[in-house]
Design a protein with these regions (language model features):
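Ligand-binding pockets and gating/stacking loops
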Residues: 1-380
C-alpha cells in the first residue's frame, strides 16, 4: 500500500496489496488460486484477512484523507490531527489511531466506476464488474466474494472452525453461487450484547454430543436416496456437516467465548458493536479463521446513522461522524495494536473500507431523516 508520506515502515505497493487478496481475490481464477496455494506448500504460515466493512460509502474527507486547506465548499466540518508519522494527518476523532499510524497505510489509488451501493460492493468484494449499472441497488452477485472463495480454497478445518465468518453479519449482496451454501459466511450476531453466544453453539437441553450424532446418522439414512438425485441437497449436506462440526467443536466454543477477555480489554476495544466485533475478530483469526468480515454499517440497532451513506437528505455528516468515528477508532486501534503485540501483524491483513467514497463538494438539504438541516456528500 502506498501513500505520499515518508514513513519508517516498509512501503507496500498497490500490486502487492492486490496480490495479497482483496480486489484481486475475485479476479484470480479458482485454478490459479489453488495452484498458488499448492506452490506455497504446507510449511507456509496461515494468513488471515479482517475486513472492517463500512457499507454505505464512508467519506474519505472526514476520515483519512482530509483537505483542511481546501475552500469551504470542499473541506468539510471536521479538523485533522497530526499522527506519529511526519506529514500524515487524520481526523480529529481518531486520536488512538494517530498514535499507531506507523502501523497502517492509507491507500488512495484504488477505484472503480460503480456508483450504486450493491454494484460497488460486488466490485470490491468479488473483483467482478457488474455487466450493467443497477441504480436500484438490489443486485446480488453472480460470483462468490473473496471470503467464500477462500473458504472453498482452504477447505474445512479439522476442528470445525469455519474459514469465513461475518462478525455480526455478512454482506447481503454477495452469494456463494456455484461454490455451494457451505461457503457462505457464518454469521455471529452482535458480540456487544449481553446474551451474545455464537449462533447455535449451545445444544438443546437434554441433547448431548452422542445423541446429536445419533440424530445425524438417522437423518443421513432418510436422505440417502434423495441426495442421489438432488444437487441442491448436496450443498445443504455440506452446510449441515459444517453446522454439526461447529456445534460439537471445543475449539469453536473457545474462540467465541468472550468471557475469557479481561474487562480492561473489552473497555479498550469499546463496549459497542464495532469494538467488540474487532475483539471477536482477533480471537477468530487466532483460532485459524481465514476471513472475518466485520459488519460496520450501523453502530447499533437504534442508531439513526444506520449506514455510511451520508447524503445531505439522509444524515448530517458532522453529527453522524461524532457517533461513528470514536467507535471506529477504539476498535481498529486496539485490533491493530493487539495483532502487532501478539506477533500476528505479518499474518493478518486488516482492511477498513466501504464500496466507494464521497464527492469532494459538500451538499445541503433543508431536512434529513432526523427532521434537521442536512449536510452531506454524494457517491463518488
Amino acid at each position: 500500500m502506498s501513500n505520499k508520506y515518508s514513513t519508517p515502515v516498509r512501503r507496500l505497493h498497490r500490486r502487492e496489496f492486490l496480490r495479497a487478496g482483496t480486489l484481486a481475490m475475485g479476479g484470480m481464477t479458482l485454478p490459479e488460486l489453488l495452484k498458488q496455494r499448492a506452490i506455497a506448500g504446507s510449511q507456509s504460515r496461515p494468513t488471515s484477512v479482517i475486513l472492517f466493512w463500512m457499507w454505505g460509502g464512508p467519506s474519505q474527507l472526514e476520515t483519512y484523507d482530509m483537505k483542511p486547506d481546501a475552500p469551504s465548499e470542499f473541506r468539510g466540518p471536521l479538523n485533522p490531527i497530526k499522527t506519529n508519522v511526519p506529514g500524515m494527518e487524520i481526523c480529529e476523532y481518531f486520536p488512538l489511531q494517530s498514535k499507531i499510524a506507523d502501523k497502517f497505510s492509507i491507500v488512495r489509488s484504488l477505484h472503480h466506476k460503480m456508483s450504486s451501493h450493491n454494484d460497488g460492493s460486488i466490485e470490491v468484494l468479488t473483483g467482478k464488474t457488474p455487466p450493467t449499472p443497477d441504480p436500484t441497488s438490489t443486485r446480488v452477485s453472480s460470483h462468490p466474494d473473496f471470503g467464500m472463495i477462500t473458504s472453498y480454497a482452504r477447505g474445512t478445518h479439522a476442528d470445525g472452525m469455519p474459514q469465513y465468518v461475518g462478525a455480526q453479519k455478512s454482506p447481503f449482496m454477495t452469494r456463494p453461487q456455484y461454490l455451494g451454501a457451505a461457503h457462505k459466511a457464518y454469521e455471529t450476531g452482535d458480540p456487544s450484547k449481553p446474551e451474545f453466544g455464537a449462533k447455535n453453539l449451545t445444544l438443546t437441553t437434554g441433547l448431548d454430543n452422542d445423541r446429536l450424532e445419533s440424530r445425524s446418522n438417522l437423518l443421513s439414512q432418510f436422505d440417502v436416496m434423495r441426495r442421489r438425485f438432488d444437487a441442491q441437497a448436496n450443498a445443504m449436506d455440506d452446510f449441515n456437516r459444517m453446522a454439526m462440526n461447529i456445534l460439537t467443536s471445543p475449539t469453536v466454543a473457545n474462540a467465541f467465548d468472550m468471557s475469557q477477555e479481561t474487562e480492561e480489554t473489552k473497555d479498550r476495544y469499546g463496549r459497542h458493536r464495532w469494538g467488540q466485533s474487532c475483539l471477536l475478530a482477533r480471537r477468530l483469526v487466532e483460532a485459524g479463521v481465514a476471513v472475518v468480515n466485520i459488519d460496520a454499517a450501523a453502530p447499533s440497532d437504534t442508531s439513526k446513522n444506520f449506514s455510511w451513506d451520508d447524503h445531505a437528505s439522509a444524515f448530517h455528516i458532522d453529527y453522524a461522524q461524532r457517533e461513528r468515528l470514536p467507535q471506529v477508532d477504539s476498535g481498529l486501534a486496539s485490533l491493530i495494536t493487539d495483532l502487532h503485540d501478539r506477533g500476528l501483524d505479518e499474518d493478518v491483513m486488516v482492511i477498513a473500507c466501504g464500496e466507494f467514497g464521497r464527492t469532494p463538494r459538500i451538499t445541503y438539504a433543508p431536512k434529513n431523516f432526523s427532521d434537521q438541516p442536512g449536510v452531506g456528500r454524494d457517491h463518488w
